[in-house]
Regions:
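Short beta-strand-centered segments that line the small-molecule binding cleft or hinge
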Residues: 1-9, 13, 22, 72, ...
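Well-formed, non-transmembrane alpha-helical positions, independent of function
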Residues: 3, 24-25, 47, 69
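Short beta-strand/turn micro-motifs composed of small residues
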Residues: 13, 33-35, 61, 112-114
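Short secondary-structure boundary segments
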Residues: 15, 81-84, 108, 114
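A late-sequence structural motif
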Residues: 21, 95-138
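Secondary-structure junction motif
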Residues: 30-51, 118-122, 135-139
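Hydrophobic hinge/microswitch elements
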Residues: 37-95
Length: 143
């Protein structure tokens, strides 16, 4: 396996929302997230649990664009990669809030079966390592 890229997750609220520094600041609020198997949603749930707070309803949404639109309209909050927000041309209706590193810093890995490290997988690995300029985490005999 190798790290494909690192992401920064941020909490987003409507632009009028006060600063968020801990889970209690948004306790009981509606959150928009992907299904419960989403690792980003799990980070959000861990942040609440470890902060001793409880979110309100968690509404499942199937796209970042819909999630951001709901947040911009003041319907709730969401967690999203900062790179997704960088693609949005008008961010004036949302506000971003940093998360502590253990919740906000994530790595996405390219993994492959030990018996299936094909030339195509190697080419993908090399392309990702070159594009994101990160050293390989392990050799081609990975998991």
């Amino acid at each position: 396996s190798c790290v494909a890229f690192d992401e920064e997750l941020v909490l987003i609220t409507s632009s009028e929302h006060q600063a968020v520094t801990c889970p209690q600041d948004v306790q009981g609020k509606t959150f928009f997230a992907f299904r419960n198997s989403c690792s980003y949603r799990m980070k959000l749930e861990d942040w609440f649990r470890e902060g001793g707070a409880q979110p309100g309803s968690i509404m499942e949404i199937h796209s970042y664009h819909a999630m951001i639109a709901c947040v911009a309209g003041g319907a709730g909050l969401a967690i999203t990669p900062a790179s997704v927000l960088a693609q949005i041309s008008d961010r004036t209706r949302i506000r971003t809030h940093a998360l502590p590193a253990q919740y906000g810093k994530v790595s996405t890995c390219l993994i492959w079966r030990r018996d299936a490290f094909t030339p195509n997988v190697d080419a993908m690995k090399q392309l990702m390592l070159t594009f994101f300029a990160q050293p390989a985490a392990s050799d081609s005999s990975a998991t």
